[in-house]
Every structure is written in C-alpha cells, then in structure tokens.
Amino acid sequence: MPDFFSFINSVLWGSVMIYLLFGAGCWFTFRTGFVQFRYIRQFGKSLKNSIHPQPGGLTSFQSLCTSLAARVGSGNLAGVALAITAGGPGAVFWMWVAAFIGMATSFAECSLAQLYKERDVNGQFRGGPAWYMARGLGMRWMGVLFAVFLLIAYGIIFSGVQANAVARALSFSFDFPPLVTGIILAVFTLLAITRGLHGVARLMQGFVPLMAIIWVLTSLVICVMNIGQLPHVIWSIFESAFGWQEAAGGAAGYTLSQAITNGFQRSMFSNEAGMGSTPNAAAAAASWPPHPAAQGIVQMIGIFIDTLVICTASAMLILLAGNGTTYMPLEGIQLIQKAMRVLMGSWGAEFVTLVVILFAFSSIVANYIYAENNLFFLRLNNPKAIWCLRICTFATVIGGTLLSLPLMWQLADIIMACMAITNLTAILLLSPVVHTIASDYLRQRKLGVRPVFDPLRYPDIGRQLSPDAWDDVSQE
C-alpha cells in the first residue's frame, strides 16, 4: 500500500501539480496586475484595517489568525525538515518561489470566497470554494465534490498529521507514550472545537501571534549568534536550488527536480495557496474596507508570514546545524529537534516540542472549523452531523499518533492534490471575475476613495451573489 501511495504521489507531484500551481500562480499574477508586488507596501495598513469590526462576521484580523492557525502547523517545522532531507537546501528557495507565486493565487481564491459568501440562519457569513463553484460557475456538483475532499482532508487526514508530529516530538524529548499523547491532545481539541467559529476565532487572534513571535524571535537570536555561518547557509540554498551542488565526499547530491518538487509540495502544505482551504476563513470575515479584494490582500499577508518568515526561520535553524543530511536517519520533527540540540544545547529539543504542541494544536482546531463550514454547504449542519464530525476528529487525533510518518504525509499529499486540482480549475474558470475585482479595487484606490464593492455596477456578477451579502455596503 505505501508503494501504491508513493506511485500516485510521484504522478501527481512529479509533473501535474507543479505545472498547475506554477501556471495558475503566474496567470493570476498577470491577471491581477502583479497584485502581490503592487500591495506589498500596503500590508501594514491592511493589518491595521483588519481589526475594524463589522456586523455579521469575523473581523479580517480574526479571519487571518484563523487561517494562519491552520497554516502554521507542523508543516512549518516537520514539513520544512522533510523538504530539506528529500530535496536538499535548494528546496527552501523553491518554497520561497512557490510562496510569492502563490500569493496571487491566494488573492484570487480568497477574493472570490468573500464575493460569493452568504449568511447562515444565525446571520454569520459562510463561504469558500464550494460556494463559488455553485454560485459563480453554476456547478453545485463540483462544490459537493470539493466539500467532500475537504471533509476527508481537514476532518480526518491533516489533523492526524499534526497529531503525529506532536507524538513524535514528545517521544523524542521525553519518551512519552504516543497513545497517551493522542488521548490528551484529542480531549483538548474537543474542548476547543465545541466553542464554534466565533469562539475559535477569538482564541486564535491571541494564540497565533504569540506562538509565531516566540518561534521567530528565537530563530533570529540563534541566527545572530551564528552570523558567521549565515553566508555559507544562504549560498548553499541557491547552489542547491539550481542543481549546482555535486555529490562529493560521500554526501548526498540533489537534482533540480528534487529541489523544485519538494519545495513546492511542502510550501503548499504549509501556506495552502491554491488548495481551497483558506477561502473558508476569508469568507467568514466582514471585510473592511467592504470590498472582496481587501480580504484577498489580508490573506496574502498570511502566506508571507507563514512561508517567508516562519518556514524560513525553521530552514535556517536546520541548515545552521548541518546540511540536512547530517541527521538523515531522523524524520521530520525529530530532525529539527536534533538541530536545535546542536544549536541551543540539551534544552533545544524540549523547546521545539513546546512549539510543535502549540503549532499543531492550533492547526487541528482550525482544520476542524474548515471541515464544519463545509457541512453547511452540504446541508448537513444539524447537531448529529456536527457531533459525528467532532467524534471523527477526536478519533483521528488519537489514531494519527500511532501511524508511521511517511504514510501520513503520503495520504496528505494525495488529498491535497485532489483539493487543489478541483479548486484551481474553478478559480481559473472564474479568472475574469478575479480580474474585475482587482481592477475595481485599483480603480477606486487611484481615485483616492475608500474601495466599496457595488454589485449594481456589475449586474452579471450581481445576479450570482447571495441577495443579503453585499446589499448594505452597496448603499454606503
């Protein structure tokens, strides 16, 4: 069975996904007028606006923190370690490339989710890829297919991956039994997810910034302490990225395809650009200024923080301690624990364990929120279905601590590809709408007015929208 999963992954990620992700990212970069570069200087202002409260939804900052909670999981630690061991230091460079290109894709999918959102019976905004497939494309069947993929991925597999990382970290540092880890983590997860969307969002708006700051500041201090090695580390990234590094002295050599494949894989698992997960959080926000593009820009910040800041910090720590092959017998999170012991002494692994617990717990909780959101699209938002999903998540967290790491990641990669292919197909078909959103936002900014989306200006789009999603702002 592992060989079968490995074959499927090699087909999907050896060619199909790389070309699709790269092509979609380049296409949306062009169609949006290089949106990730145009507004990068506005990230600070966008963050300031994101705390502006609006009725009927989360603040943009709460939405960003919820999406970051899902992004900033063990993929930022274990995933980076796996990328370096499988693709060499050059995989880090291709993670950066994938992140910059992915910003445009994220802008597109999150803007569409915000545009096609609707209110549930409680007045809370709901939306995501399933909604823009149904409303924007008129293909509800496609939305149902995507929602099922997401329920499998976020309700089951990805939470197991995160739990696996916690179990391995605790076992490596304290020889803690994986089953006990799974039970304790599952109980805390159940307590958190019963708080609902708003409760989780309030929890994450304080939790996520704190844990990110702890990890990044620690990494910066270690980099400063080892500043003499940084030029060599940075050169090794670029040298390996383009296949210049030859196998010599018994060390493993890495091909260009290995670096690109692993860089794109791990970048996508970490920042989720194009996968269709983040739009579920983006749609829940009452955007400020009241324009779909404003939420798209806020969610681009999430990719910047996730990959270009947090993942880079993890990569630097691993490469400062060795070249990624030094601890080849170790897998994933254990590799970065070993690296931190080299850099920080005996308590380095224990520190990583604490960070992994924080990252993975927040990711598991946010993963559940995404899955529950899609129950609403499938019209299964009744107490029985919701509790069934909660029990599945509870069981998956326990089960994930007992499975092997390679098998968990292979399953994650396959379902991630299925989600991405479905979502990217939809947003590429909706690219004229993305172009309209981006152009309308830019037009109003050039006029010096606060961007406000008016569906009456675009009647073809307006007819596709939920009648109560944008009526209020169109009259401002």
Curated annotation (Swiss-Prot):
Gene3D superfamilies: Amino acid/polyamine transporter I
GO molecular function, one term: amino acid:sodium symporter activity
Membrane topology: Multi-pass membrane protein
Transmembrane stretches, start-end: 4-24, 81-101, 141-161, 174-194, 207-227, 233-253, 300-320, 351-371, 391-411, 414-434
GO cellular component annotations of the record: plasma membrane
Subcellular localization(s) per the UniProt record: Cell inner membrane
Disulfide pairings: none
Keywords tagged on the record: Cell inner membrane, Cell membrane, Membrane, Symport, Transmembrane, Transmembrane helix, Transport
Similarity annotation: Belongs to the alanine or glycine:cation symporter (AGCS) (TC 2.A.25) family.
Name of protein: Uncharacterized transporter YaaJ
Organism name: Escherichia coli (strain K12)
Gene expressing this chain: yaaJ
